[in-house]
Amino acid sequence: MGAYDELMKRRGRALLPLLDPDKVISEEDYYERAVKALCEYAATFLVGGSTGVGQIETEKTVALVKKNCDKPVTVFPGSPCQVAPSADAILFMSLLNSTNRKYLIDYQLEGSLLVYRYGLEAIPTAYIIVGEGGTAGWVGEAKAIPPEKPELLSMYVLAAKYLGFKVVYLEAGSGVKRSVPPEAVRLAKKLLGEEVILIVGGGIKDEEVAAEILRAGADGVVVGTVVERDLSAAERIARRVAGWT
């Protein structure tokens, strides 16, 4: 089953662990344990999100996941040099609220032939930075959407829907203090309906935050920093997302 089909199958309880190749290649033993621990709960593993990481590091991380889990591996690219031929899929993203056109369309043009050549499953994804934004917002030169401005979020979410994106990814930023607020998630899901998958990431530190986001209507949650820092907490989140606790 492909990555998109796995997301559809697990709508409302999809877990997407995010692995940073820069961290993985320096702590392989730890991440092998992490992949094994989260495998049964994951819809797909995301690989990427790093700055200064190329195809070699991304490929090594994809290989580590595939060695320890049979779930699809999806590239979460920071640039075209992270497109990995051994991956199963790629979030073919546009950072809609970036002020730099390379994150809107230039990187997509550069990467499109690689995606085609490698035969990756391309999942059209609208990436939208909300709130603090963290490193993702800074690197992506995004005008982060203030959570208290629902009309701004509505414009971006509807634009993503009408442009035909299959997935909308609301990102608060890695390691931020606050995740995307439930009311913002609820609004986004109301506007997207069942036509578009809604995933949310950033600031998901424990199972209660994850459950709150899913109750608000998200189809899935992305967890990255908590996997790096506290595998036990990541497992608790995974069990709650799966509905097993």
Curated annotation (Swiss-Prot):
SUPFAM superfamilies: FMN-linked oxidoreductases. CDD domains: PcrB_like. Keywords: Cytoplasm, Lipid biosynthesis, Lipid metabolism, Magnesium, Metal-binding, Phospholipid biosynthesis, Phospholipid metabolism, Transferase. Mg(2+) binds at D20, S50. Its cofactor is Mg(2+). GO terms for cellular component: cytoplasm. It comes from the Archaea. Its EC number is 2.5.1.41. GO terms for molecular function: magnesium ion binding; phosphoglycerol geranylgeranyltransferase activity. It is an enzyme of class 2 (transferase). It is found in: Cytoplasm. GO terms for biological process: glycerophospholipid biosynthetic process. Prenyltransferase that catalyzes the transfer of the geranylgeranyl moiety of geranylgeranyl diphosphate (GGPP) to the C3 hydroxyl of sn-glycerol-1-phosphate (G1P). This reaction is the first ether-bond-formation step in the biosynthesis of archaeal membrane lipids. This is Geranylgeranylglyceryl phosphate synthase. It comes from Ignicoccus hospitalis (strain KIN4/I / DSM 18386 / JCM 14125).
